[in-house]
Each structure stands twice: as C-alpha cells, then as structure tokens.
C-alpha cells in the first residue's frame, strides 16, 4: 500500500498554504469560539506527537486560511470545554510538516492507518439494542421548568421525536444540552467532518450549504451552494449519526443570536434509533398478520413498516368522514371501529385488529364513500397517499377484487 495521501481530504489534519483565499465567514478564536463541532476525540487514543495546531484550509473552521498558528485544536469537546493535553502542548514539539502520511504506534494510530485519507466514523451496530446488556446510563443535564417548556416546544413538531413514548421523550429531553450561538456566520458543522452531535433549532435560522466535492474547500465560496434554511423546530446532523457517514452539509448561523439543543451520538442512537428499530420490528410482526399483505416479500413489508405513522383515536371520534378527499390508507392495530353511510342508521361494516380501510378512495381518486368511527379507543397505522401508491402496488388487484357487497368499507 502506498504511503502517499492527500492531506486535504483528512478531517483531522490541516495544512496551511500561502495560496489559500480568505474565508467569507467570521473567524472564531479558539478561546472564545464556543466550538460546536468536533472529530470523534474518543475514537483514537491520545498521542503526545499528534498534530494539534496545524493551520487549517477549511474556511468555515479556521477563518483565514494560511494562518497556521490559529488553527483549530482538537483537544476540546463540541461545547468548547478542554478535554485533552493538546492546549498546553509546546509549539516547538509540533511537526512542522503539518501531517504524517501514515500512522504507527509512535503516533497513537494503527500501522496501516493512512492519516492523509478521509476517515469514516466508527460505526455502532445497526441494531442499537445489540449492546443493550451493558451498563450504559443516559446523560442527564438538569434544566429549569422554563428550559423544559422551551425545549418541548422546539421538539413538538420534529419528526424524529413523534414516535417516542413518554419515558423515551423524557430521556432525550434530559440528555439535550443548550448551545447558544452568539453571532451570525458561525459554522456549526462542516461538510465532510465526522459527526458527533444532533442539533435541534430553538431560536434563529441556519443556512445549509453543500459542496459537490463532498467537503468544504478553500476560498470564500468553499462551503458550496446554499440549498435551504432551517428554522425553529427544525433539526440537522442526524444523517451522519444514523449512517455513520461524514457530515453531508455545512450549517451556518444567519442571525446575531441563535439557540440550539445538542444530543450526543450515543444517546441519539440508543434512544431515537432504538425506538425506530423496535417500531419497525413491531410493524413487521403486525403486517405479517394482515391477510391483504401476506403475499408480499419480507423486504416489501419492511418498507411499508418504515412508512407507517401511528395515530390514536378515542372512542366515538371519526377517523375518516364520508365525502372527504382520500389522502391516506389505514390499518387497524388495536381496538374496534365501525363504518357508517349517510342515510343508513346501522353500521355497514365493523373492524378489528388487522382490518384495513380507505383504499379505494386512493385507488380511484374519489371522495370517501363512508365514514369510519372508533367504537372503542383505537390505534391505527396510517399510510399516506404517496406511500400507498409506491408501496402497495403488488396488492392493488387484490384490493380492487374485493366486492363492496361483502366489504363496503373498500369504497372509503
């Protein structure tokens, strides 16, 4: 294996060059930057010879490229707290070459580790519960009632939290850390960097930039093209944690004062991904019991499971109403429901666990032909129009063959 490597692709190493152009973003001094991004400090053991202050060519991290004395030190955690021995290291002990092509025991890395290459994040198991027998305890950061109220408002509409039960929600809220962003044009995460934290926006707006090269480049336009803006209640940073991949975009603050809440990688995977994994397993088991879907392959049912949303209705509440446009398909998970038609006093159909309704209004693009009301408290799995069209194609003919005389609900 060749020892040659490109330092520009390595998120842990910075090489200063005289040709680098100044950044269009504000430089943030190390002692006051409130740095919110970090390579995974715990991934590698400490090395007394590690490069800690080489100049950066990342315009969103180091400000003006080429100022090697002001580069980011990796001895701090994502919240600006010093964690290692890098800060007090004698400048004379730092390798003037700025990088080492390969690792080795002397450098604190494996012999075959190429420092010049971009590194991937160390992956946990895809099944977050696979290590559930250990003694992991979720972090807990005390919060005032006012902070909790603000935080609950911030996460109330976030899709990643919509399926958590009360205990899981409380664990996540306790683990979140408030992160004030004190100025405009502060880089929160950089494309291509390792991902350690997931962020929720409470206050302020943040622009999203993507560079086609896959990482931030030198120069005023090194962040790439702006593709969107994230506002209060939004979130970012989950993809790198979910898929153990480098950051997919650069996020920059746009207002003089903003507030984020940060959730660390381990808690994110243990709580949010564990919830998603268990939810998929639950739905897969449920879908296997639905006669309509018995002909589907396991991977097809898994796709449906990922697309379902759980909704609860109290007894007496209408799930769908006659005459309304058809926008979703429903599977009854628990409880009992009944279908009614205008002019008919008695229910025209009863439902129990495993039954479904709402399909023909989607198949034929017609209004609902009947109303469905919860007889008891019910829990339904809802599949939206797009997911229905995309995922239930293999059983469309089965649904169309069902006779209305024996199953009037198919017209709903």
From Swiss-Prot:
<keyword id="KW-0114">cAMP</keyword>
<feature type="compositionally biased region" description="Basic and acidic residues">
    <location>
        <begin position="16"/>
        <end position="29"/>
    </location>
</feature>
<feature type="binding site">
    <location>
        <position position="359"/>
    </location>
    <ligand>
        <name>3',5'-cyclic AMP 2</name>
    </ligand>
</feature>
<dbReference type="InterPro" id="IPR014710">
    <property type="entry name" value="RmlC-like_jellyroll"/>
</dbReference>
<dbReference type="InterPro" id="IPR018488">
    <property type="entry name" value="cNMP-bd_CS"/>
</dbReference>
<feature type="binding site">
    <location>
        <position position="368"/>
    </location>
    <ligand>
        <name>3',5'-cyclic AMP 2</name>
    </ligand>
</feature>
<dbReference type="InterPro" id="IPR050503">
    <property type="entry name" value="cAMP-dep_PK_reg_su-like"/>
</dbReference>
<feature type="region of interest" description="Disordered">
    <location>
        <begin position="1"/>
        <end position="146"/>
    </location>
</feature>
<dbReference type="GO" id="GO:0005829">
    <property type="term" value="C:cytosol"/>
</dbReference>
<feature type="binding site">
    <location>
        <begin position="160"/>
        <end position="291"/>
    </location>
    <ligand>
        <name>3',5'-cyclic AMP 1</name>
    </ligand>
</feature>
<feature type="region of interest" description="Dimerization and phosphorylation">
    <location>
        <begin position="23"/>
        <end position="159"/>
    </location>
</feature>
<dbReference type="GO" id="GO:0005952">
    <property type="term" value="C:cAMP-dependent protein kinase complex"/>
</dbReference>
<feature type="binding site">
    <location>
        <begin position="292"/>
        <end position="405"/>
    </location>
    <ligand>
        <name>3',5'-cyclic AMP 2</name>
    </ligand>
</feature>
<feature type="compositionally biased region" description="Polar residues">
    <location>
        <begin position="49"/>
        <end position="60"/>
    </location>
</feature>
<feature type="binding site">
    <location>
        <position position="238"/>
    </location>
    <ligand>
        <name>3',5'-cyclic AMP 1</name>
    </ligand>
</feature>
<dbReference type="GO" id="GO:0007189">
    <property type="term" value="P:adenylate cyclase-activating G protein-coupled receptor signaling pathway"/>
</dbReference>
<feature type="binding site">
    <location>
        <position position="247"/>
    </location>
    <ligand>
        <name>3',5'-cyclic AMP 1</name>
    </ligand>
</feature>
<keyword id="KW-0677">Repeat</keyword>
<feature type="modified residue" description="Phosphoserine">
    <location>
        <position position="120"/>
    </location>
</feature>
<comment type="similarity">
    <text>Belongs to the cAMP-dependent kinase regulatory chain family.</text>
</comment>
<comment type="subunit">
    <text>Tetramer, composed of 2 regulatory (R) and 2 catalytic (C) subunits. In the presence of cAMP it dissociates into 2 active monomeric C subunits and an R dimer.</text>
</comment>
<dbReference type="GO" id="GO:0005634">
    <property type="term" value="C:nucleus"/>
</dbReference>
<feature type="compositionally biased region" description="Polar residues">
    <location>
        <begin position="1"/>
        <end position="11"/>
    </location>
</feature>
<feature type="compositionally biased region" description="Polar residues">
    <location>
        <begin position="119"/>
        <end position="138"/>
    </location>
</feature>
<keyword id="KW-0547">Nucleotide-binding</keyword>
<dbReference type="InterPro" id="IPR000595">
    <property type="entry name" value="cNMP-bd_dom"/>
</dbReference>
<keyword id="KW-0116">cAMP-binding</keyword>
<dbReference type="InterPro" id="IPR012198">
    <property type="entry name" value="cAMP_dep_PK_reg_su"/>
</dbReference>
<dbReference type="GO" id="GO:0034236">
    <property type="term" value="F:protein kinase A catalytic subunit binding"/>
</dbReference>
<dbReference type="GO" id="GO:0030552">
    <property type="term" value="F:cAMP binding"/>
</dbReference>
<protein>
    <recommendedName>
        <fullName>cAMP-dependent protein kinase regulatory subunit</fullName>
    </recommendedName>
</protein>
<dbReference type="InterPro" id="IPR018490">
    <property type="entry name" value="cNMP-bd_dom_sf"/>
</dbReference>
<dbReference type="GO" id="GO:0004862">
    <property type="term" value="F:cAMP-dependent protein kinase inhibitor activity"/>
</dbReference>
<keyword id="KW-0597">Phosphoprotein</keyword>
<dbReference type="Pfam" id="PF00027">
    <property type="entry name" value="cNMP_binding"/>
</dbReference>
């Amino acid at each position: 294996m060749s020892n040659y490597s490109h330092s520009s692709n390595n998120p842990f190493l910075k090489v200063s060059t005289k040709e680098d152009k100044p950044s269009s973003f504000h430089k943030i001094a190390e002692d006051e930057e409130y740095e919110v991004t970090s390579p995974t400090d715990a991934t590698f053991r400490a090395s007394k010879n590690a490069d800690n202050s080489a100049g950066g060519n990342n315009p969103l991290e180091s400000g003006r490229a080429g100022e090697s004395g002001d580069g980011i030190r990796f001895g701090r955690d994502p919240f600006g707290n010093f964690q290692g021995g890098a800060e007090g290291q004698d400048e004379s002990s730092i390798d003037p070459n700025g990088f080492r092509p390969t690792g080795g025991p002397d450098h604190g890395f494996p012999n075959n580790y190429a420092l010049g290459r971009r590194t991937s994040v160390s992956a946990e198991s895809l099944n977050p519960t696979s290590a559930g027998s250990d003694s992991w305890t979720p972090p807990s950061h005390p919060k005032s009632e006012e902070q909790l109220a603000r935080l609950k408002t911030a996460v109330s509409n976030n899709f990643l939290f919509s399926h958590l039960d009360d205990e899981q929600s409380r664990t996540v809220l306790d683990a979140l850390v408030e992160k004030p962003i004190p100025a405009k044009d502060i880089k929160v995460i950089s494309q291509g960097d390792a991902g350690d934290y997931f962020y929720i926006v409470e206050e302020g707006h943040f622009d999203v930039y993507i560079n086609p090269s896959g990482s931030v480049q030198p120069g005023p336009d090194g962040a790439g093209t702006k593709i969107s803006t994230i506002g209060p209640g939004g979130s970012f940073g989950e993809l790198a944690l979910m898929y153990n991949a480098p950051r997919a975009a650069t996020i920059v603050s746009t207002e003089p004062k903003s507030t984020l809440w940060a959730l660390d990688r381990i808690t994110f995977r243990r709580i949010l991904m564990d919830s998603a994994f268990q939810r998929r397993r639950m739905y897969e088991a449920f879908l296997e019991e639905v006669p309509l879907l018995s002909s589907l392959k396991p991977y097809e049912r898994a796709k449906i499971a990922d697309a379902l949303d759980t909704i609860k209705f109290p007894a007496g509440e209408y799930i769908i109403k006659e005459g309304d446009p058809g926008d979703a398909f429903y599977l009854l998970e628990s409880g009992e429901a009944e279908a009614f038609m205008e002019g008919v006093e008695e229910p025209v159909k009863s439902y129990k666990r495993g039954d479904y309704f709402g399909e023909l209004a989607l198949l034929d693009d017609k209004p609902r032909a009947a109303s469905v009301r919860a007889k008891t408290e019910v829990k339904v799995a809802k599949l939206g129009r797009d997911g229905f069209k995309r995922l239930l194609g293999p059983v469309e003919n089965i649904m169309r063959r069902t006779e209305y005389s024996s199953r009037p609900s198919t017209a709903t």
